[in-house]
């Protein structure tokens, strides 16, 4: 695409919690070169928007309306495939909320609708977190040397029962295709592979409805192996409070450790491998220098991703999170579930058809829940980790 000077006309499908955030970012001017021209949901028009913002109750009508250049899809996961395909088939640009679908088969189907002129992105907003940008910079600089071990204990995604009760689709196979892996931890799995690459295999143990009245996984422990021999452990849960967020990336020349509040960088002189082969000290260790790295994480991650999406449409700016890269984290999440169901190690690349058959069996036995008639107190700032 060539450079476009006109503002990108954006429509938002969905009016739930995250959709409201995208709408605010657009109308409050946090995304330069973009204008909100339409919303879409089965409910009534949202309050407080300018009369120039059209409202539709059917996404197909919105797609055919001609009032948008790009569509943000922020709806329940089970609708992502149909809406996303409609957007791309209409030659509109797509920003999809995570995950891109219930399974990698759905993700691949969606990607097949993209054309060379499509700008298709996924809202993997944690790629804009200065913490992970700094970690990525350090890892790619080879300061850590060859990676040896990656551990991430991510159990501070606590969700109380009301979080599920007020939704008919959350934490159901039919509505979401999974639980903590595809909803909360999909961000962490994306960052894990973005920083350290894709594993070659995974053996996982998922527990279903351990802490909540749900049919999907709400607690996961997984063992990962990588091509160079590195290993990893990933733990995720929505049932622990206060929970832990500890991320360790260990190399033979140093390590990065995020303890939930601070990032530390340790550097070995010489590398562990070199010291191991050359030292005469029976109980010696390489000299290590550890520094605490100051990082200001107070940024609007969603606005940064949306700005990048708009810039890609207008000026061909490379996408921070192309839609295609959503297959990686979704593949890891799917493999962890399949490993649990089959009680065996799963190799990558994951067999999409095999996983889909298992998932479809779960979906066939699943149903959307009846929403509880309760009023939930919502503070979206408390949902981010």
Regions found by a protein language model. Give the residues of each.
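Beta-strand-loop-alpha-helix segment that lines the small-molecule cofactor/substrate pocket
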Residues: 70-77, 81-127, 142
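Predominantly a Rossmann-like dinucleotide-binding segment in NAD(P)-dependent oxidoreductases
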Residues: 127-213, 343
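Glycine-rich phosphate/pyrophosphate-binding beta-alpha loops
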Residues: 186, 211, 235-243
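C-terminal glycine/acidic-rich active-site capping loop/insertion
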Residues: 253-321, 346, 357-385
């Amino acid at each position: 695409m060539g450079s476009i000077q006109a503002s990108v006309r954006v429509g938002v499908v969905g009016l739930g919690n995250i959709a409201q955030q995208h709408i605010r970012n657009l109308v409050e001017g946090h995304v330069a070169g973009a204008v909100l021209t339409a919303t879409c949901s089965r409910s009534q028009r949202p309050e407080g928007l300018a009369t120039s913002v059209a409202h539709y109750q059917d996404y197909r009508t919105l797609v055919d309306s001609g009032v948008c250049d790009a569509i943000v899809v922020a709806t329940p996961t089970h609708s992502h495939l149909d809406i996303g395909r409609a957007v791309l088939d209409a030659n509109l640009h797509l920003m999809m909320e995570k995950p891109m679908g219930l399974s990698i088969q759905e993700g691949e189907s969606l990607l097949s609708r993209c054309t060379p002129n499509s700008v298709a992105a996924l809202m993997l907003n944690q790629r804009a977190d200065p913490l992970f940008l700094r970690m990525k910079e350090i890892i790619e600089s080879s300061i850590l040397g060859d990676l040896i071990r990656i551990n991430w204990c991510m159990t501070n995604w606590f969700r109380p029962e009301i979080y599920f009760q007020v939704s008919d689709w959350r934490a159901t196979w039919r509505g979401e295709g999974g639980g903590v892996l595809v909803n909360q931890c999909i961000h962490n799995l994306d960052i894990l592979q973005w920083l350290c690459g894709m594993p070659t295999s995974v053996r996982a143990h998922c527990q279903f409805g351990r802490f909540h009245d749900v049919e999907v996984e709400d607690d996961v422990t997984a063992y990962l192996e990588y091509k160079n021999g590195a290993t990893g452990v990933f733990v995720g849960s929505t049932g622990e409070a206060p929970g832990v967020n500890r991320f360790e990336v260990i190399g033979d020349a140093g390590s990065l450790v995020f303890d939930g509040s601070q990032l530390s960088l340790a550097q070995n002189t010489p590398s562990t491998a070199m010291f191991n082969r050359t030292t005469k000290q029976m109980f010696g260790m390489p000299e290590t220098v550890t520094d605490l790295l100051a990082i200001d994480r107070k940024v609007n991650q969603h606005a940064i991703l949306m700005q990048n999406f708009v810039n890609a449409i207008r000026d061909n700016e490379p996408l921070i999170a192309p839609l295609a890269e959503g297959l990686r984290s979704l593949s890891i999440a799917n493999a962890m579930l399949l490993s649990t169901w089959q009680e065996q190690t799963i190799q990558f690349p994951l067999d999409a058809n095999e996983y889909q058959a298992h998932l479809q069996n779960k979906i066939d036995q699943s149903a959307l829940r009846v929403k509880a008639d309760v009023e939930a107190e919502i503070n979206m700032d408390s949902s981010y980790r």
